[in-house]
Amino acid sequence: MKYILSISCFVLSGLGLYAQPQIKIAKLKYGGGGDWYAAKTALPNLIAFCNRELGTNIAPEEDIVEAGSKDIFLYPYVFMTGHGNVVFTPSEAQNLRNYLISGGFLHIDDNYGMDKYIRPELKKIFPELELIELPFDHPIYHQKFKFPNGLPKIHEHDGKPPQGFGLIYEGRLVLFYSYETDLGNGWEDQRIHNDPEAKRQEALRMGANIISYCFTLAF
C-alpha cells in the first residue's frame, strides 16, 4: 500500500508551512503491557505549538492507531512513547515496515524504561538495519529552531546525555528515536511535571523541528 498523503499538500514559504487540507497525526497503540497511552497532553500541546510557530494546519487532537492497523497509512507522523514492555506481532512488524518504507515516519520517545524493550522489537521491523546516532549537524536539529548540540535534556534520570538515534532506509530517515531526554514529558501541560517554562519551550521547539523535518524533508 502506498502512503496516501502527499507532501505536495504542503506549501513552503518564508513564514513556515501551510497545510491544505487539515492533517492528522497519531499516537501508536502497541502490545506487551507498556503504557502506550502515556503523556496524554503532549501531542495536543505540540500540535498547537506547531500550528502557531510553523503555520501548519494539524488537527488539534491526535488519533490513536494500532500497530497492525492499515489506518496507519493515513498519518505522516506517528508518535510512540511509554516506560515499559513493547511487543510487535509478526503482522504488526510487517505493517509498520510497509508504512515506513512507503513514506511514513515514526518518532519513538523513550519515557524512561522503554529502551531495552524497543530495540529488539525494531529488529522485527528492519532486521537489516541498525539504529545509528544522528550527528549534531543532521537537518532534524536545524529546522526553524537550532539545536547545535543535538537533543535538549528535559528530565534527568541517571545522568546520561540525551541521544537521537535513527533508522535510515534507502537513504531516508524513517524512524527517529529520542533517548534520555523525555521530550514528550516536556510537551505536557506545565502542571503535570512542573517543568520550568524554558525547558518546556526547548522540548516544544525540538518537537516542532521533528514535525517540520517529517513534513518537508523525509519524503
Task: Go through each PLM region and give its residues.
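Sec-dependent N-terminal signal peptides
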Residues: 4-13
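Aromatic-Pro/Gly-enriched surface loop or interdomain linker
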Residues: 18-77, 81-84, 174, 182-183, ...
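An acidic, glycine-rich "communication" segment
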Residues: 24, 29-33, 39-42, 115-191, ...
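Short alpha-beta junction capping motif
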Residues: 25, 77-116
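Surface-exposed patches in mature extracellular/periplasmic domains of secreted proteins
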Residues: 57-65, 108-111, 129-136
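Alpha-helical scaffolding within the catalytic cores
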Residues: 60-67, 89-94, 159-163
